[in-house]
Each structure stands twice: as C-alpha cells, then as structure tokens.
UniProtKB/Swiss-Prot annotation:
Pathway: tRNA modification; tRNA-queuosine biosynthesis. The gene is queF. Keywords: Cytoplasm, NADP, Oxidoreductase, Queuosine biosynthesis. The lineage of its organism: Bacteria, Pseudomonadati, Pseudomonadota, Gammaproteobacteria, Pasteurellales. Its EC number is 1.7.1.13. Belongs to the GTP cyclohydrolase I family. QueF type 2 subfamily. It comes from Histophilus somni (strain 129Pt). Substrate binds at I86, E87, S88, H226, E227. Catalyzes the NADPH-dependent reduction of 7-cyano-7-deazaguanine (preQ0) to 7-aminomethyl-7-deazaguanine (preQ1). This is NADPH-dependent 7-cyano-7-deazaguanine reductase. InterPro entries: GTP-CH-I_C/QueF (IPR043133), NADPH_dep_7-cyano-7-deazaG_red (IPR050084), QueF (IPR029500), QueF_N (IPR029139), QueF_type2 (IPR016428).
Length: 279
C-alpha cells in the first residue's frame, strides 16, 4: 500500500461516525500537503510565496458558564506552508464537540480553536470568531474580473486534461483578472461534488480564454480536495502560460456548515474573507 493510500485510509470522511458533543480536540484529522505536492513536483519548493486556506465556519456553538448556548461564525486562515491541511469532516465533528461544553467567553473559544488547529496543521493558523450581529453586516461580494463563462463554444471533455492549456498565450503583454463560476470537482474520498468560483489574476502574455475555460471545465469529474485543485491550477498555468505574476483564488460552496476558499499567489497578499452569492 502506498503512503498516499495509508494517509487517506484513516480519515473519517465517507464513513459512518458518531457525533460527540463534548469538547475533543483529537477529532481533528490532518492530510499531509506532501501527498499532492509530490505529484505536482513542488514538495521541496512551492511556486507561490503567499497563500492560505481560508475557511468560514457557520455552525459553532457552545455553552457559557451559566449553561446558555452561544453561537458565532469563524474566519480561519491556514497558512499554505503548514505541513498539513485540515480534513473537512473532522473539522465539522470537532466543532460539533463544543456544543455541550462550557467556556468562559468567546475569546476563550477562539484561543482554543487556534491552538488546536495549529497543532493539527503544524503551521500558522489565524482564527477570528464573529458575533452574528457583526457578520450580518457583511455584504455579498463578487470576485473582480471579467467572467469567461458566456463563450459560445461546444464542450465535450469533462476528464481532467492540463494539455488543454497548450499554446494558450499570445504575444500581447497584459494584466488581467479572469473569473469563472463553472469550476466543479469532486471530493477525493466521497466523490461528492464541490462547486466553486475561481479568479485568476495574472501579469504576462495574454491567456486564451477559450482554452482556459475548457481547462477549468475539465475538472468536472476530477477527484481532489479543494486546496489541491487550486495548487494544480496554479502549477498548470505557470507551466503552460508562464506568467510573470499569478494568483489563483477559488471560493467553494458550503458543505456541513463549512466553506473552503484556497488562495495561492507569487505576488499579492491574502484577500479578505468575503462570501459570494452561492455561499
């Protein structure tokens, strides 16, 4: 059995599990980033210098010291240089374990979340808990850029094929932000669909939009975690388009009270966590 198979075999994802309602940090499970990065040839050195897995957790509740339930929404940033990514079902089960446990205040819960996620990810993690009153003021955002989805083309390829990007640039030097709402991949373990919007910001020779859209649609039956898909897109664009500067940012729809929004760039900092219409 390969190391890749052994690491994934222990995950709770796709298995019947018991929901525990008293705090238990051991419910968190890690997936080594090395698994996917070995395949991409970037385990030793990544082609991006900025990045995070930006999570929003909508289903967080605990009891105060008088036994009254409290609720909040969390913004979580897991640094791309962390050794592990966090497996999503284990994160959901872990958050559920707060439900019947008492904590002094929101700040204590925030501190515990951050400490536990740092240990699991083995890297930098930022956590901010938001009251519902504060979060309700956050507007629905849009990713800036030109949408490439309305092209009048015929699509027949739904199997992942990076070679669809071959000869994808012309000689015109541009800075562009391109957006597609048609990103869809499948969970590596359960095969459940993952729906996302992706923004590609680059400086370099102009990328052919038809080729780019065909490439993105080819993820439609591809099985990989969200974070891995974004790193694959980044690496493929660097290989075939060879831009001077590149950012890839995907915002995926919510599942189990969590959305995951990976960002990778070689030139710009991590964006604010602003939800889109489908989130």
């Amino acid at each position: 059995m390969q190391y890749h198979d052994q690491s994934l075999q222990t995950l709770k994802l796709g298995k019947k599990t018991e929901y525990i309602s008293t705090y238990d940090r051991t419910l968190l499970q890690a997936v080594p980033r090395k698994l996917n990065r070995d395949d991409l040839g970037i385990s030793t050195k990544q082609p991006f210098s900025f990045g995070a897995d930006i999570w929003t957790a909508y289903e967080i509740s605990w009891l105060n010291l008088k036994g009254v339930p409290q609720v909040a929404i969390a913004d979580v940033e897991i640094d791309y240089q962390s050794e592990n990514l966090i497996e999503s079902k284990s994160f959901k089960l872990y958050l559920n374990s707060f439900n019947q446990s008492q904590f002094e205040n929101l700040q204590q819960v925030e501190q515990i979340l951050q400490q536990d996620l740092i240990k699991c990810a083995k890297g930098q993690v930022k956590v901010r808990l938001n009251s519902l009153q504060n979060y309700a003021q956050q507007p629905i955002a849009t990713l800036q850029g030109e949408c490439i989805d309305e092209q009048d083309i015929e699509i027949r390829c739904y199997e992942f094929d990076p070679n669809l990007l071959e000869n994808c640039t012309n000689k015109q030097w541009v800075e562009e932000k391109l957006v597609s709402h048609l990103l869809k991949s499948n969970c590596l373990i359960t095969n459940q669909p993952d729906w996302g919007t992706v923004q590609i910001h680059y400086i370099g020779n102009q990328i052919n939009r038809e080729k780019l859209l065909r490439y993105l649609i080819s993820f439609r039956q591809h099985n990989e975690f969200h974070e891995q898909c974004v790193e694959r897109i980044f690496c493929d664009l660097m290989k075939f388009a060879q831009p001077e500067k590149l950012s890839v940012y995907a915002r995926y729809t919510r599942r189990g009270g969590l959305d995951i929004n990976p960002f990778r760039s070689n030139f710009e900092p991590i964006p604010l966590n602003q939800r889109l219409a489908r989130q």
